[in-house]
Each structure stands twice: as structure tokens, then as C-alpha cells.
Amino acid sequence: MSRGLGDVYKRQPIDSCDFSLSHYEADGDEADASFESFSFARVEKYILPMLADAEAAYGGRLEIMLSPWSPPAYMKTNGERNHGGKLKACYWKRWAEYICRYVEEYRSRGFNVTMLTLQNEPKAVQTWDSCIYTAQEEKIFLRDYVWPSLAEHNLTDIDIYIWDHNKERAFEWAETIIDAETDHMVAGIAFHWYSGDHFEALRMLRERFPKKKLLLSEACIEFSKYSAEDNLANAQKYAHDIIGNLNEGMSVFLDWNLVLDELGGPNHVKNFCDAPYLFDTARKQLVERELQSYIKHFSHYIETGAVRIGVSRYTDKLEITAFQENSKIVFVLLNRTQEAIPAFIRLNDTCAGLIAASNSIATGVVNI
């Protein structure tokens, strides 16, 4: 890609999530089993125009992941979108059909939905849209309801990612779900970063399930935990996690929000967060955050189809990842310390010295 972030993967919610303006459902009518009242108007008004503009700027099609935060309130044991609750057993089939309808609505309008998760953060009871599953329940939902519905609608070309929650429990979840019956249904494991690094968990997943893709489906800096003023620290957190994940087998990193307002919203439960761009609504100005430049070191230079290659380092003060594509190698070097650190980049019999400046990130491109 000649310009921009090179960010071609996007995740969109099935119905509302915390970053929606308010709760909404395409069809919240319990009596409407055939979805006669299903309305895509909200998505058409707020989401599709931005996706279309992004594709026009990119000059190609984005790859879109769909994820539900909650089934319609009437389908749940607690009768509301928020505060967890479970999907009632009598609605498992209808909910699977609802998800298929969402995929069809996007695709019928020309948008390239290629990925699907079954539930955002299935172990989290949130003050916003949420729903709880056990690993066994997600397995049954996938095997007996979602996959058959996808097959009925000729949608089995979509990649299904299980889990979609923090890294530290991803291995046990995958162990429960993936077996001889479900292996062909599961393209990979999606994960978030909110409980810490847990790079070892990704290593175990890669070793146990070498043919499954590892995909980070959500990451953002919550202003409830981190300061908006810590622009550099927030950006470094991203780079540290991306490098650690890539080195353990991650193939896609999906940032949660590309653009938010100056408060880190809108968010209907005030769960404000950082983003690569913040839009100042008073001045009508787009403010580029440090996150943008740090993410660009990966998304702009490491192109789709590049293959990760092995690296080693003499000190843990430097973090590095490297990829090869055709006749070039791209490496990204991160120094989060307060000191400049010397380093040598060696490839076969060729060696080049450099200084990694304090609090810096650098990308190198080596023609081979």
C-alpha cells in the first residue's frame, strides 16, 4: 500500500455494543420468528457510509469481522441487553438464523464479511451489551446451531473464530471446543489483551493447534485505567503487544476503534477509550494520536501474505519482530526504555549497527 495505515481488517458489531450511540436491535420483536420486521436501517445510516468511504480511500475491499455483544433482550434469561445473562435454549436456533441474516445483509450490499465470532467476551458480565457462555455451550451453539444455519444459507465460506476474550483462558476454551466434530468449523481463535501479555498462552495455542489462525479481535486503551495524556505510553503498549503477539503466531491485529471523539467516545455507557485518531468536535479537527504512528510501523510495512521469520536479541530492553515477503525483509524495533541502546542487525554474513533511541520505534526494510 502506498499510503495510510494499511489497515484492511475491520470488526463490526451485530446490533449495539458499548460504542454505539444507544441500544438497538435489528429485530427485537419476540413474535417475529421469521424476521419480517428485521431492519438494517441503523447500520445503513451510521456504519455502512463510513465503510464505503474507507473502501473508496483504500481503493479495494476491506475484510470485515462481525461479532455479537448480545442477542435481542427477549432471547435472554435476564430480559435485557446489559449485565450478562444467557441465551435461552429455546432461542438458540433463532439466534443462529439472526446472525446469518446479518451476514447476508452486509454481503447483499457488497461488503466483504469474511470472519465471524460467536460472542464478544463470553465470560464477562458487563454494564453494557453482554451475554455469558461456557466453553461447552459455545461448542454446542457452534456445532448444532450456527454451523447448520450457515450451511443452509450457503455461508460456510466465512471463517469462524471462537473465544473472542482475553488471552489467558484461550487455551482451555479451544481445548474444549475443538475436536473431531468441530475442527472443520473453526478457522481460528480470537483474543483480547485486557488481562495482560500472556504471550505464553498464544505459544501453547500455536503448538496445540498449529493449523488454526490466531487473531487479536479487540484492543483499546481505556481512559478509566490509563490517561489520555500518556500519549507515548499508550502507543508503546500497543507496539509491545503487537510484537509479542506476532512472535507467537498472531496473523491479524484488529484495533477496536479507528476514530473517536475528543472524549474517547461516543459510548452509551461512557466507557471512553483512546484511538489512533480523535476528532475534536468543537474545532472540527482530526487529531492524530501517537497510536497512529506506532501502529503504522506494522500495518503499513508488513504486508498481507508476509511470513514471520525468527529473530533473537541480546537484551530484553529491545523488542523486535521481522517478516519476509518476496525479496525484502521488514523488521520493527521497539525501545521503551529511557536510554539509547546499541544494536546490530545481522542477516547471514551481513551486519549493520544502529542505535535504538530512547522511547523509540523504528522500521527497517532490507532488500535481499
Label every model-predicted segment.
Residues 1-5, 9:
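Single conserved hydrophobic/aromatic residue that forms the stacking wall/gate
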Residues 92, 132-239, 247-248:
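Noncatalytic carbohydrate-binding groove/subsite architecture in carbohydrate-active enzymes
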Residues 213-293, 310-313:
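Aromatic/acidic polysaccharide-binding cleft in carbohydrate-active enzymes
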Residues 300-301, 311-348, 359:
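Carbohydrate-binding surface patches
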Residues 6, 64, 116, 189, ...:
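Conserved, mostly hydrophobic/aromatic
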